[in-house]
């Protein structure tokens, strides 16, 4: 019989979101009359922008004609999409990023896990706490950690707490680490990093030959001036950082699937013999070997994001969710509940009232308000006592959910 990958057995029982689903299903079965509003998983609800839909329909028609039919595309994605990304998302912000350094993929979640294929097994890895669970679980699956302790922390990982006291932006590690996961605007806390904070991380990485894996999936939600949208706005980042981006939350592509990863050609890693190897070549080899690219139709839809009409429609979509976040924040304040985030991100990080634990707060919201959030402890031990609410929902659902919460907690 074939041997399994035993590292999977180290994963904590049940991924966070399946456990949420289990509890919600049990409650719904016991209370079929309850109108449950789900504000947990960050999936979008509003339609694709018209510019994207029109471009995709046109691409479908092209696929129906021999003269314009497309088969396998380029390993990195079509150049016209990569050029649009480089021009609008990076060069327009003064970032020295070329289209050849951009790799189109079907999701930043996939890329955040797949990037481990080109990294060694003996790196010291730092993650923030709380953190997007994918960063941790993919390292566990790859054998980069030991078992989890009673707090759910894995042996071998360096945890950097995000707290209200440090404004949910982690302090630099006291020791040398090789790989650093950063996500700003942050999931789950909704916090952002200032230019000075990111410069400190870049300086640390360059001083210690560390690699920053920078998740910028929510950069379109930044509203405050002066907050960097890309790690490459920081001098020196080309020599120490890989950036992950996605069209999922920017343009509603969660069901359409398109994202991209930026690997500068000046970025180097060290081989076992001490020689320096450029990571661009390794990632190109990995992608061309294991990935067949994103559908032509989808890439045309993504390209339309950068059209004049697409930019207007995407900004309106983002603003819709940010308005939801504002409603959530302000209504929680009315109920006397402390909350963070929701200004530069679609997530609101809610402090559990009355000394409740994360899961106790989750259960109380579910049972008394019929509202589903995401327990903060599911993102790490430092998330205990918090709960994440997502602004990805209809306006009617958000307003009704907050009405219920105010009626229960505001009395």
Curated annotation (Swiss-Prot):
Pathway it works in: Amino-acid biosynthesis; L-lysine biosynthesis via DAP pathway; LL-2,6-diaminopimelate from (S)-tetrahydrodipicolinate (aminotransferase route): step 1/1
N6-(pyridoxal phosphate)lysine modification, residue list: 249
Binding, substrate: 15, 42, 109, 132, 187, 292, 388
Needed co-factor(s): pyridoxal 5'-phosphate
Catalytic activity reported: (2S,6S)-2,6-diaminopimelate + 2-oxoglutarate = (S)-2,3,4,5-tetrahydrodipicolinate + L-glutamate + H2O + H(+)
EC primary class: transferase
Key words of the record: Aminotransferase, Pyridoxal phosphate, Transferase
EC number(s) reported in the record: 2.6.1.83
UniProt-listed Gene3D superfamilies: Aspartate Aminotransferase, domain 1 (3.90.1150.10), Type I PLP-dependent aspartate aminotransferase-like (Major domain) (3.40.640.10)
Signal peptide region: none
Ligand binding (pyridoxal 5'-phosphate): 72, 108-109, 132, 187, 218, 246-248, 257, 292
SUPFAM superfamilies the UniProt entry points to: PLP-dependent transferases (SSF53383)
Assembly and oligomerization: Homodimer.
Protein name: LL-diaminopimelate aminotransferase
Source organism of this protein record: Synechococcus sp. (strain JA-3-3Ab)
Taxon lineage: Bacteria, Bacillati, Cyanobacteriota, Cyanophyceae, Synechococcales
Gene symbol of the encoding locus: dapL
